[in-house]
Amino acid sequence: MASPALAAALAAAAAEGPNGSDAGEWGSGGGANASGTDWVPPPGQYSAGAVAGLAAVVGFLIVFTVVGNVLVVIAVLTSRALRAPQNLFLVSLASADILVATLVMPFSLANELMAYWYFGQVWCGVYLALDVLFCTSSIVHLCAISLDRYWSVTQAVEYNLKRTPRRVKATIVAVWLISAVISFPPLVSFYRRPDGAAYPQCGLNDETWYILSSCIGSFFAPCLIMGLVYARIYRVAKLRTRTLSEKRGPAGPDGASPTTENGLGKAAGENGHCAPPRTEVEPDESSAAERRRRRGALRRGGRRREGAEGDTGSADGPGPGLAAEQGARTASRSPGPGGRLSRASSRSVEFFLSRRRRARSSVCRRKVAQAREKRFTFVLAVVMGVFVLCWFPFFFSYSLYGICREACQLPEPLFKFFFWIGYCNSSLNPVIYTVFNQDFRRSFKHILFRRRRRGFRQ
């Protein structure tokens, strides 16, 4: 968006006056006034330089918001690391931010710079409803995400089985329906022009009941729910950490490291990646042909019994805490009275070892998933905190005005600043994902630089 073009369009619109038949309907501000003289636009509240500067800043904000959130959508839909069902919430949230940038912010900017509403009565109602809808949907999305985080922490196994893409999509539809119900009143309660105003205006219902109900439904009630849910998540996480520290004991007599609650011990690092479990399989067990060769040697009289037994130990010796496993292997491989190795015993030990390895692998995967859930919960907590910081000043001052009117009214420039800070929140989520989440950062680099390299090759 080039700021000179936008400024020129605004100047042309101001010279033309309100469009269509709505101009006369909106009072003396449209077409010709009551005395029959030509319509004169209101005196500009900003200089030409200020108009160009504001248009440039907001234009950059719009472009940055659209590009950043489009990257989020592409990353979630194309990256294997981000294809978890719960990330569909982020796609829907990014879509709401894109709609704010394309359907709300340009008209808010024009209304601010021109000092009157140029776009007609019908679009005024639609614009106000969309404004409230997208803001409300953002916070209701965050509320649904906080509940998703809570259930994934407190009911990890059961909830993860239930959290399918279909269920997540149904929840997203419910979020948009709830937001639409909350934002519907502006369609029927917006006001056209305050008494005594010379120019058409577009604003929300100024009655106290609407101001307070919209602030509570669109902001304060969801914020309260999010705060309570995340406080509960923090308590559960703190309790689990305390329980885990109590379960950890000193190293055992065989030097075994303390184990975690899922028996993995130190296999999982802080980055959520599991160290591969030690595979206690001897070199002679790696080949079925080798096992058959040894059994044949044992049948011929056990002449190589001692050598076979010498091969049963691993190259590095038994790992900590695996003495019982090694004992079972040695006993199973010791030939019976007739110099024969029990085939049933060998198979049972092999089955036991394979089951142990599968259990360790399953525990490792679960540990990695839990670490990823923990990082995701932290990132979303940052997103929610930033959202509240951006929108709280506006909703607090707006509700304060609804209670005590002029006695509590803020200076108009400060109120408008709070209003635009709320809009800025739509551009911040991609930045938060980039800073705090390695999967998003890697995916953004892959999307941007891979396509750029393709362009250079062409």
Curated annotation (Swiss-Prot):
Q: Where is this site: Implicated in catechol agonist binding and receptor activation?
A: 214, 218
- Return the Pfam families for the record: 7tm_1
Give the record's membrane topology: Multi-pass membrane protein
Q: Which residues lie on this side of the membrane: Extracellular?
A: 1-51, 115-124, 192-207, 404-416
Which species?
Mus musculus
Q: Does the entry feature the keyword Membrane, yes or no?
A: yes
One of the record's GO molecular function terms: protein homodimerization activity
Pull the Cytoplasmic topological domain ranges from the record: 77-88, 148-168, 232-379, 438-458
Keywords from the named record:
Cell membrane, Disulfide bond, G-protein coupled receptor, Glycoprotein, Membrane, Receptor, Transducer, Transmembrane, Transmembrane helix
Its biological purpose: Alpha-2 adrenergic receptors mediate the catecholamine-induced inhibition of adenylate cyclase through the action of G proteins.
* Record gene name: Adra2c
- What protein family is recorded? Belongs to the G-protein coupled receptor 1 family. Adrenergic receptor subfamily. ADRA2C sub-subfamily.
- Report whether Transmembrane helix shows up as a keyword of the record: yes
Q: Signal sequence: where?
A: none
Q: What is its main location?
A: membrane
Site label Implicated in ligand binding, positions:
131
Extract the SMART domains matched here: 7TM_GPCR_Srsx
Q: Which PANTHER family match?
A: ADRENERGIC RECEPTOR-RELATED G-PROTEIN COUPLED RECEPTOR (PTHR24248), ALPHA-2C ADRENERGIC RECEPTOR (PTHR24248:SF25)
Q: Name one GO cellular component term.
A: glutamatergic synapse
The record's section on CDD domains has: 7tmA_alpha2C_AR (cd15323)
Specify the protein name: Alpha-2C adrenergic receptor
Residue ranges with Basic residues bias: 291-303
What residue ranges are annotated as transmembrane?
52-76, 89-114, 125-147, 169-191, 208-231, 380-403, 417-437
Which cysteine-cysteine pairs are annotated as disulfide bonds in the entry? 124-202
The UniProt annotation puts the region (Disordered) at 245-343
Locations listed in the record: Cell membrane
Q: Which residues are glycosylated?
A: 19, 33
